[in-house]
Design a protein with these regions (language model features):
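N-terminal leader/targeting and accessory segments in enzymes
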Residues: 1-106
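Phosphate-binding loop of NTP-binding sites
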Residues: 96, 103-143
Length: 143
């Protein structure tokens, strides 16, 4: 059970796409997918919301370790699991990576790179809401 929830809704990307996104972090693939062209639906980090077709990324945090919930994710129909160590006895492919948090970022980066639009971030302690509302008004007037 992680505090974070789903991240990346997929347009049904393939297992092969996922392997390519993780290539810099991937150590091994444990278990075979039924088909490399089989597709997943979304990426999640909270085992409580896993649905059939989801990729579950097991993140380790201060309070809990997502690896404790691999069985729950598998039983909920996870398409595959992104893990730092293999959990035996699960009938779902496990993509073993050096660091699951970094792998999570690689998946997000690969997804984001599919789109050729600019991305802007607003950070800081004060004024974020005002700044984003002003940006929205300016951009809406132009587009």
């Amino acid at each position: 059970m992680q505090a974070e929830t789903e991240v990346i809704p997929s347009e049904h990307e393939s297992f092969k796409w996922l392997l390519e996104a993780l290539c810099d972090e991937l150590v091994e693939v444990h278990g075979d997918p039924a088909n490399e062209d089989a597709s997943w639906i979304r990426v999640v980090t909270d085992s409580r919301i896993v649905r059939a077709g989801d990729v579950f990324v097991a993140l380790s945090g201060e309070r809990t370790d997502g690896h404790r919930y691999l069985l729950q994710a598998a039983e909920s129909g996870a398409f595959c699991l992104v893990v730092e160590h293999v959990e035996t006895g699960l009938n779902v492919p496990q993509l073993v990576v050096e660091n699951s948090r970094r792998a999570y970022g690689l998946i997000a980066r690969a997804w984001r790179r599919r789109f050729g639009i600019a991305l802007t971030a607003v950070g800081g302690s004060n004024g974020k809401t005002t700044t984003t509302q002003m940006m929205k008004a300016i951009l809406a007037a132009h587009w």
